[in-house]
């Protein structure tokens, strides 16, 4: 089933989003798998490389004492005042207007996924790269997308972003009709939490 899911993601869904009107725009805010590779019974994916501004130019304070210069700008570094003030070089922080831009870009990306009938299922600050210096954002890890009624979720989400109804029914088996799994509706909960954290630097 995972192979079929990936074929759908790199085939029909990729074409529908990136070969249509505005395809180039979406290429800037998604890192979407664009091919499958099979070797020795192993299955892999190919995907675009991240833009240069999604890697730390200066890293952390005190001559990069955390040794993160050149590493990916995972959203978690920017989603709390504590992380920013305690660890990050001032030149990496950007400004509040750029965090607003980031929130808008992530919202557009999620809306586009949902319009294609897809749910991310694990939307969190670990699966979004951000650059507060330029106001850019990119949704990553889209190889596990949920196609409602066809391909169920592989994961339930990341703590801090899991919708309450998913947590409430997590003790039930996946086959139980009362079990609530990640979906387009629960993506919206995760999106709201993510934007709140980028704009107010704390968890709601």
Predicted regions and their residues:
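Conserved structural core of kinase catalytic domains
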Residues: 30-98, 102, 151
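Catalytic-loop of the protein kinase fold
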Residues: 101-103, 110-132
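The N-lobe alphaC helix and its flanking beta3-alphaC-beta4 segment of protein kinase-like domains
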Residues: 2-26
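Activation segment/activation loop of eukaryotic-type protein kinase catalytic domains
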Residues: 126-171
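Conserved C-lobe activation region of Hanks-type protein kinase-like domains
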Residues: 182-186, 195-204
């Amino acid at each position: 089933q995972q192979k079929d899911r990936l074929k759908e993601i790199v085939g029909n869904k990729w074409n529908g989003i990136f070969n249509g009107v505005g395809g180039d725009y979406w290429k800037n805010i998604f890192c979407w798998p664009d091919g499958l590779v099979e070797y020795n019974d192993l299955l892999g994916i190919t995907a675009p490389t991240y833009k240069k501004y999604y890697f730390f130019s200066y890293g952390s304070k005190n001559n990069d004492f955390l040794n993160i210069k050149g590493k990916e700008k995972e959203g978690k570094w920017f989603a709390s005042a504590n992380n920013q003030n305690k660890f990050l070089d001032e030149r990496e922080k950007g400004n509040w207007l750029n965090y607003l831009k980031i929130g808008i870009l992530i919202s557009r990306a999620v809306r586009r996924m949902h319009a294609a009938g897809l749910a991310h299922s694990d939307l969190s600050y670990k699966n979004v790269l951000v650059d507060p210096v330029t106001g850019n954002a990119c949704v990553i890890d889209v190889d596990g997308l949920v196609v409602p009624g066809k391909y169920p979720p592989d994961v339930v989400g990341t703590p801090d972003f899991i919708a309450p109804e998913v947590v409430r029914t997590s003790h039930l088996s996946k086959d139980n009709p009362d079990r609530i799994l990640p979906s387009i509706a629960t993506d919206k909960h995760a999106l709201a939490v993510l934007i709140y954290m980028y704009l107010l630097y704390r968890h709601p």
